[in-house]
């Protein structure tokens, strides 16, 4: 059914954008501060 192709692509695009935004949000708010705290604590311990 060629009528469904634009809806399929819009659905795929919408879910792709939400997936990318979710990954970006999780990376920026969860993983990056965790890595930064780990790096700062290693730096602080090595200076002792």
From Swiss-Prot:
Predominant cellular place of this UniProt entry's protein = mitochondrion
Which keywords label this protein?
ATP synthesis, CF(0), Hydrogen ion transport, Ion transport, Membrane, Mitochondrion, Transmembrane, Transmembrane helix, Transport
Transmembrane stretches, by residue range? 13-35
Q: Please, one GO biological process term?
A: proton motive force-driven ATP synthesis
Q: Name one Pfam family in it.
A: Fun_ATP-synt_8
A GO cellular component annotated for this chain's UniProt record is: proton-transporting ATP synthase complex
Localization terms from the record: Mitochondrion membrane
* UniProt membrane topology term: Single-pass membrane protein
The answer to whether keyword Cytoplasm applies is no
* GO MF annotations in UniProt: proton-transporting ATP synthase activity, rotational mechanism
On subunit structure and binding partners, the annotation says:
F-type ATPases have 2 components, CF(1) - the catalytic core - and CF(0) - the membrane proton channel. In yeast, the dimeric form of ATP synthase consists of 18 polypeptides: alpha, beta, gamma, delta, epsilon, 4 (B), 5 (OSCP), 6 (A), 8, 9 (C), d, E (Tim11), f, g, h, i, j and k.
Q: Name the PANTHER family on file.
A: ATP SYNTHASE PROTEIN 8 (PTHR36101:SF1)
Membership in a protein family: Belongs to the ATPase protein 8 family.
Main role?
Answer: Mitochondrial membrane ATP synthase (F(1)F(0) ATP synthase or Complex V) produces ATP from ADP in the presence of a proton gradient across the membrane which is generated by electron transport complexes of the respiratory chain. F-type ATPases consist of two structural domains, F(1) - containing the extramembraneous catalytic core and F(0) - containing the membrane proton channel, linked together by a central stalk and a peripheral stalk. During catalysis, ATP synthesis in the catalytic domain of F(1) is coupled via a rotary mechanism of the central stalk subunits to proton translocation.
- Name of protein: ATP synthase protein 8
Q: Which organism is it from?
A: Eremothecium gossypii (strain ATCC 10895 / CBS 109.51 / FGSC 9923 / NRRL Y-1056) (Yeast)
